[in-house]
Design a protein with these regions (language model features):
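Long amphipathic alpha-helical scaffold regions
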Residues: 225-260, 289-292
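Autoprocessing Asn-cyclization modules and mimics
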Residues: 88-146, 277-293
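Long, low-complexity, polar/charged, intrinsically disordered or flexibly structured peripheral segments
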Residues: 130-201, 206-216
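Extracellular beta-strand-rich solenoid/capping regions of secreted or surface-exposed proteins
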Residues: 15-55, 64-83, 91-105, 191-202, ...
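Short, solvent-exposed linear motifs at loop/edge-of-secondary-structure regions
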Residues: 45-59, 260, 265-291
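Acidic Gly/Asp/Thr-rich repetitive segments characteristic of extracellular carbohydrate-active
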Residues: 1-8
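All-beta strand scaffolds that present successive hydrophobic residues in beta-strands
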Residues: 9, 55-58, 79-84, 181-182, ...
Length: 293
């Protein structure tokens, strides 16, 4: 009834499975079009709908997404606080490999342990619950300079893949560029069919002291909402994980919102696009009802 309520988690790791998620259809700005994704149903881990004056205190807990998922949704809510927890993914939809050896027509790469692969007809395929890809987009990362570039993908012109041992692969090419030892490739497909978090038609929202160790297929999208604060949040790979990438594209996307958008005391590392993006919302007219409607 709108009276303030605080929900506290017992510290620990809470695995949220795609198969058991809340499945709700949402149209979200800057995500995959209906041509590529005719069913934009989101698979939601933490779902708050039409709630008022609720605080979710994770008390240091981790919400671990298992599968391609939207970690949280706040829909038509007011006065909501999410604080003191971590968001991570068991098998991030961006895979990573490090070059151990290079020849004129081959690479030997170390696969990050969170990246699942299979070899089908000598071709390499990455996969998880609800997703897979064989081609896609890549960026390359240099640990020494800590620089990342949009780059050639080790999935291009691939003739065959051989597993030398678990998580070590021999990749043979028809042709390839010189890439350099210990280059790390961050690979993904181009489909933004889920987001990390979604704040929709809500107001007075605070995200506080949250570690976003991985941000799904898109960042936290705030759409048609009002007065949002992001304070002391960390958007970066989990320390000690060995991962170098934390997100598909933008980390925070603010679309068609109003009031005060206050992002402060926060850290952004490892995005494949902008850390913060604020803009209007493109809407396609599908029907004219009358001269004034």
């Amino acid at each position: 009834k709108g009276r303030p309520v605080t929900v506290k988690f017992s510290p620990g790791i809470y695995q949220l499975d795609r198969a058991k998620s809340s499945q709700v259809l949402y149209y979200i700005s800057n995500t995959t079009s209906e041509l590529d994704d005719p069913d934009p149903t989101k698979h939601i881990g933490l779902y708050l709908n039409t709630l008022k004056n609720v605080t979710i205190d994770g008390c240091g807990s981790t919400l671990l997404m298992n599968g391609e998922m939207t970690s949280f949704v706040l829909d038509k809510c007011e006065g909501i606080v999410l604080k003191n927890f971590n968001i991570d993914y068991k098998h991030p939809t961006q895979t990573e490999v490090e070059v151990l050896e290079e020849g004129n027509d081959y690479l030997i790469v170390q696969v990050h342990p969170t990246s699942q692969y299979r070899i089908v007809d000598a071709q390499l395929e990455w996969y998880g619950d609800g997703w897979s890809f064989k081609n896609g987009i890549a960026q390359s990362y240099d640990r020494i300079s800590e620089m990342t570039w949009r780059s050639w993908s080790p999935m291009e012109n691939l003739l065959r893949t051989v597993e030398l041992r678990p998580n070590v692969l021999y990749l043979q090419y028809k042709e390839k560029p010189q890439v350099g030892l210990h280059t790390i490739f961050q690979m993904r497909d181009s489909f933004r069919d889920e987001v990390s978090g979604f704040v929709n038609r809500s107001k007075g929202i605070l995200l506080e002291n949250i570690n976003f160790y991985y941000l799904g297929n898109f960042g936290v999208v705030c759409q048609y909402s009002e007065n949002i604060t992001v304070d002391r949040c960390n958007f970066a790979p989990r320390p000690g994980s060995g991962r170098t990438n934390a997100g598909f594209a933008d980390f925070i996307q603010v679309s068609g919102c109003r009031g005060m958008i206050d992002i402060k005391n926060s850290r952004f590392i490892g995005a494949h696009d902008d850390p913060i993006n604020i803009h209007g919302t493109h809407l396609r007219v599908i029907e004219f009802l009358s001269d004034n409607r």
